[in-house]
Amino acid sequence: MGPIRKPVNQWELSENVKRNLGTFGEMYVQYSTSPSQTAAAAVFKMFGQYLRTLFQTHLEILQSDGAGDPSVRMDVLQRIEELLGTTVSDDSVFEVIEAHLSKVKDIFGNCSVTWIADVKAADRAVTAAVTGTVHAVTGGMGAMWGTLDRAMIDLKLDLVLPPTTGPSTNFVGVALPATPLVPYTAGSAQGSPLDPTLDRFGALFGLFGLTIPTATKKVFLEQNDILNKAVQAISVSYTAMNSNFQAGLAKYKPPRVPTADGALTARGIAPDRPRQAKYETVKTYATNMGFDVLIGGKVPGSKGDIESLVSGILLAGKSLDELGALVGGIGSDGAIVSRDQMDQVRSLIDSLVKIIYDTDRDRFIAMTGVHVITEYANDLLRVLDLIAQKYGEFQRTISGLEPSWATIVSNTEGLIPLYAERAAYAAERAVIIDEFQKMAMDHANNVKEVEHIRERAAATQKQTEERRAVDIQKLAVETTAKMTDMKNGYEKTIADLRAQLSVANLSLESLKGTLKGETTLGTTVMDLSKANRQLESRVAELQGKLGIQENEAKLRDEQHKAQAEQIANLHRDLRVATERLHKKDTKILETGINTGVSTARVRELEQRVKELVAEKKSIRHENRMARRKMDPTEAAAKGGPRQSERPRSQTAVHAHCALIRKNLHDTNKRLLTRNTRLEKSISSKEELISSLTIKGNALSSQLADAREQHAVLKREYDALRAERGGTARTKKDALEALQSKLTQSESQLAIEKLKVMELEAAAKRLGKSSVTKSEVETVEVRVNLLTEELARTKKTVDELRKLNNAYLTAKDRLQARVEALTTDNQSMKLLVGNGGTLDEANKRITTLTQRLATVSGELVTATETLAFVRGSLKRVNHQRDELAKESAATKKSCEAQIRALTDRHATEMRTAAGARDGLEAELGRVKRTLVDTETKLAGVERDRVVLRDELTRMQKASHIGADRQLTHAEKVAHDMGVLNAGLTLARTELREIQRELVHEKNKSRDAEQRHVASEAALREQIRTLTDERDRLLATGVADLQRENAELHAAITEAANTCADTKIQLENITADYNGLLAEYERRLGRRPPGPVDPPATTEEPIAGYGGGNWDTGSGAARAPIDHHDMFGISSLLGESQGGLSDYHGSYAGGRELSSEESGDDESVDPVPDSNGTRGDGVCREEDEEDRQGGETESGGEEEESEEESEESEDEDPPSAGGPLELIGVPAGGIGADPEPARVPSRRPVTLLERRGAHVAEPKPTPRVRGKRPAARHSHKRVHLSITRETLRLALAAGPEMSAEEIFQRLNTDMETSSLINSLTVTAADIPRGQLAVLNRDTAVEYATPGTPVSDRDHQRVELSMKAILLIMICAKHGIMNHEEFTDGDLSWFKSYDNNLSVTGSDSE
């Protein structure tokens, strides 16, 4: 088995169980092949050790720090990620748990647990089996094997136990119902009382493919006393564990949490409280501590599952957020402004204290249970070791076992409980019997019909044989007469041919004399043929070189395309330079505007200097009077102080300010002059750029013309090649003319062949009897009918399969509804336990009874439908098999008859072929004589003429093609020279532009150095303007220099490419001339045709749009925008998107309307220090008024359209999406806003504390106080719903009522994200009173306490999607069910289909 690595977390533990169970299986396979005593003892010893390690490791992981304390584990997704070992994004909690359960089911085999509720039920059944075995099974053996059963079920091996008898009890005196379990298939209902125990023994080892013979049972009974003592020890340990657990719970001391009024008091763990009832017994806690913790993802907490544990912690976090929001909204003096706020603060504090108590109590219970369960597990493991040790004594009998994997399969099938389906199977059996009887009758009828068809086929075959004998005799007589006529005709034809042959022999003798004189001519013709073959080989060689030249021409064309792209890049770079110059002009204009702003600042400083001088004079006057101990009246009477200092101080100040104004005026004038000069320079550079653009376009047109000429030459070359192909076709025509006479002589033979074919056709027609055709047609009709019946049967089977699938779907839906009813029943029990009224319980019971009756009826109907469908499917399958067999038999019979007819016809054809072969042999000899004679006579003269014409034509075409090729190469070289000259000119002009820009830069620096501020009072402002101007000018010049360098590099590269292309053209021309000279030297003439490069596809030259102007990668480089440096948008009154301070203006802020924005025109807006919109310049008291106004009424800033579009178009992230909300006034939608004393801060959400991205919510426009609220003002509220938000909603506890849900949907920012596209039509909705109207179904849902008379004015219309999410919250316990009085909720069963919808609605 190898070493077992100790896991460190639950995921590794699960993988370890999976791997080692597979290893145990391999060990048993090896043992089964060669059984021995040593191997058996080793296997079971290692299995016992592994069980001990498994239990201890599981308990250590639960208590270790690495796995996390169960009471502090907060995040459900983190818990699931640790269990799965993978990253979980935004899937819902329940889907992940269900997927994990399915994976565990595959790992551990035939595990029937599919949900957490089933896990709890299975654990309760195991506990009942363990505690009830002492009373149900004879002796202590039953208790021992019950303990083993508990261990096996903890390992999810699903060992099925025999039924227990009598009620079983746990150790605290609470009666448990008897658990009926499916008995083992070995027949436990008969035999001795020890048979059930022995059956369990066999089932345990049957899991591993082993069987227990009688000898083993005997040894087992001998060990009864020893194992009974072990079971008694386990019972004592169990009782001690229970006592220790109760004692540990009694030691619990609740924490002391101070409260304001001391109304809440801490309580201990009391057994009589319903909330703590499930922790009073070790049985229930041991269930929670079993292996279902590993599988179902549970943690020891308040309720033993993930949802309840996390909901309390999330509720605490949410309460803290709400408390922070309330505290932030209270006034600066600390007073609570309303009774509602006071009640809300008190309830939040109480809920926080309650959560602290519950969390601490659950943590104590979990730790106590961990301690006591560890001791019990150790005792249990010791007993398991004892069992493994004693089983080593069974090795003498085990060695004789013959395990078989077939036994494993049969035992596994016997373990599956089938009681629930026996009734359905019995009904199906009756239906199947009826259908079988019907099918038997149909089969008998089909057999009779087949026998009748066979009889008819036999009679038909007999008639066919008789008619065929008569027809063959007639055919033999007619054939003999026709063969005689054909023989006479052939003899006459042969005599004529022999006469013609004698005449041809005489002509041949005369031609022989002529041929002797033509011997020299024949020799010449042979020489010409040899020269022609050499010429053809050379032509093939030149064609190969032509292919190479064509490839080189393609490369040149690609280089031309690259050059065209480089020219286009140069055009784009020139355009970028033009845009940069325009931007520089804009920046200079902005500098002038800022200079005007500085002038206004100088005036303000002058006013401030005047005020300071006056204040200084007053202070000196008072000091002087104090020194003289005189009041101002006496000083005035005695002449007062000297007045000469004041005029002198005022004059100095005025002179100083005049000097400053003069300097600023001169500076402004110099800047305007420089601006004019730069504009002229820019216009001149634009003219240069336009001229370069025109030249580039001219080069592009020349390149296009060159391509057109190349295409024309290519077409001519194709025409010449076609003409050369025509010459070859002429030679072929000459050869065909030589065979024309042969064709004439063959025509007579063809006529005779046609006659023979007619005879063969007649024989075939007569060989087939009409009776045989009728018989075959009859059989074929029957086969077609059977085929159609089979197709209809297949169609029926498909329809039945569809019905079966529909039934399975309906069954799943019914199961879901049954689970919903179970949840309703549990919630009703909770309602009664919490003190609900009897009337409410009765109403709920009535509703559930009706729904249960409906579901039961549908279940019965679906079961009957399934039985009928299964019976019909079996009947149709049987009928299809019968039809297939009958069709195969009929087809086989038809094929046998056809083969017999074919053999008979072949025999007759062989007889007729003998006479035909003799005639064809004689005609063949005549044919060969004629062909030899005519070929020798007609070949010589025509070949001589054809060869002479071909040589003349090829020589002329070769001269013409060579001349055209040289002309084309010279033209391409000339075009490249023109292109190189144009690029050189463009490079020279760009260098001139660069020198001008450098000169302008030097002049600008000189002007900047001369412009230095001379006054200390304004030195800081003037230095700021100078630095800004220097930075802008340096940036513009550096960009232009960099662009010029890039243009220079591109032009240099293009020139180098042109030079390389020219060299390549020269080399190609030289190679061509060399080949031409070699051709003429060897053959004494020029080649037969021109050799030109192939035509290329014209591609348009790239324009100015698109593409990266720097690298050509296809993405345009965004221009740098320095717009924000000067605050131009602030000067024009526009808002910089994303820079407004939302936190300080949300609670009490308001948005100025178009009328209000024009009331205050005395404020001159200027940019403040951070670039956002300022509030004005002029007076300090204006600044103080603005600060006071923000405190009382606020000043909310507008958001730009770009920011709004970006926030709406953004997709939410996959995990932890943004909760982007639109806030609503505290009084409800449409209510008048209450003035807040301080700006309230937005509370920090739970997602922000975890680090998730939460976007800034958009502030809602506020309505002015002096404006009365409209009763029906339609408002649009766009909200978003994500899986993260839904997960938070599902994790919330049931403490929130429906009224609180509705209030948060309309007033609270955090929980209003539960609804997607909430449309509110009521203008004024009081708190606590609300009615919801579904626009799709016209169904109204009213909250308690809503007056009927005012309902029309307090209605909120929700879309189907919004109500759908509310109902999901209700399903998971956030609100109570009975507050929705409408009964038609059939659409609610498909709510899962809408969970993936995100974003805002367009309604």
From Swiss-Prot:
User: Could you tell me the superkingdom of the organism this chain comes from?
Assistant: Viruses
Ranges of Basic residues composition bias in the record: 1261-1275
UniProt biased composition (Basic and acidic residues) = 620-632
**Which parts of this chain are annotated as the region Disordered?**
620-650, 1083-1116, 1142-1239, 1253-1275
Q: Compositionally biased, Acidic residues: which spans?
A: 1154-1163, 1193-1212
Q: What is this protein called?
A: Uncharacterized protein ORF22
Which organism is the protein's source? Ictalurid herpesvirus 1 (strain Auburn)
Designated gene of the protein: ORF22
